Design a protein with these regions (language model features):
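Catalytic-pocket segment enriched in acidic/His residues
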Residues: 5, 9-10, 48, 55-58, ...
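Generic beta-strand structural signal
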Residues: 71-74, 94-96, 110-112, 119-127, ...
Length: 280
């Protein structure tokens, strides 16, 4: 299933794409796509429902984030060896873990803010994992039992704040609008091979990133198992899994976003985002 949220910010309705590509209002079955409802039981009920009988939502309305109010937004850094190389970093022997503030989450086509004085705003197309039930101290072979689905993420990063301001990466990763997710939460049964999905990102119509999830250093099962050793994961938690090469920081000379720039990104079977950078 492809689940999404449609409507003005703060008033989104949960929906699902039916077999004809129409968006059906599922609010009679689930109040919202939040941690209270993002679980395997809810998905099972929706899969058995007669979607064609549900009201249709307008495809021209704003698409919100595919999840609202997740408990955690966990991120994995330098998870593609060629991306690590372009940043001058060593290939990690274990997953590099950091957090993004959940308040940074916005819809897939919402504006991305650039604040006064920001000089190194960067892009990162990434695969997001959505957890479907409590996950604690599990093996890699158990990981798929805990994964509800996947989504497209743009891990927007202000590199000066991330690297030059001292401390952890979270400062450069967490400003409002630095976490566009969606358009869809795609349940895992719709993905034939999560470890072989094409991904790309364009800035102002120019291709910047081209990659495939097959080149991740740590695949989704490893990541979920690894994180579960250090923190419990709950239904609705998002894990974004790292980016392929082609970020602005890795270019020579470096290139960063400015007000008026546009980003278009996609991952195979997970949909597409279109964002504009606006001055705050």
């Amino acid at each position: 299933m492809k689940l999404l949220r449609v409507g003005n910010k703060g008033n989104e309705k949960p929906g699902v794409l039916d077999k004809d590509g129409k968006i059906r209002d599922i609010s009679s079955h689930v109040k919202d796509l939040n941690p209270d409802h993002l679980n395997f039981e809810t998905i099972s009920k929706l899969q058995s429902a007669d979607l064609s009988s549900l009201p249709e939502l307008s495809a021209s309305d704003r698409i919100g984030s595919c999840i609202t109010k997740p408990g955690k937004f966990v991120a994995i850094g330098l998870n593609y060896s060629d991306h690590a190389a372009e940043t001058g970093a060593d290939v990690p022997s274990e997953p590099i873990v950091f957090m993004k503030a959940t308040s940074c989450i916005v819809g897939p086509n919402d504006d991305v803010e650039i604040v006064s004085g920001s000089k190194k705003l960067d892009w990162e197309v990434e695969l997001g994992i959505i957890i479907g039930k409590e996950t604690k101290h599990i093996s890699e072979s158990q990981a798929q039992d805990h994964i509800l689905g996947y989504c497209l993420v743009n891990d927007i990063s202000e590199r000066e704040w991330q690297i030059e301001k001292m401390g952890q990466w979270v400062k450069g990763k967490s400003h409002d609008t630095y976490g566009p997710i969606g358009p869809y939460l795609v349940t895992k049964d719709e993905i034939a091979d999560i470890n072989n999905l094409k991904m790309n990102l364009d800035v102002n119509g120019k291709r910047m990133q081209t990659g495939n999830t097959s080149t991740m250093i740590f695949n989704v099962d490893i990541i979920v198992s690894y994180l579960s050793k250090f923190m419990s994961l709950q239904a609705g938690d998002i894990i974004t899994t790292g980016t392929p090469p082609g970020v602005g920081m890795g270019m020579k000379p470096q290139q960063f976003l400015k007000a008026g720039d546009t980003m278009k990104l996609s991952i195979e079977n997970l949909g597409e985002q279109n964002s504009k950078v606006v001055a705050l």
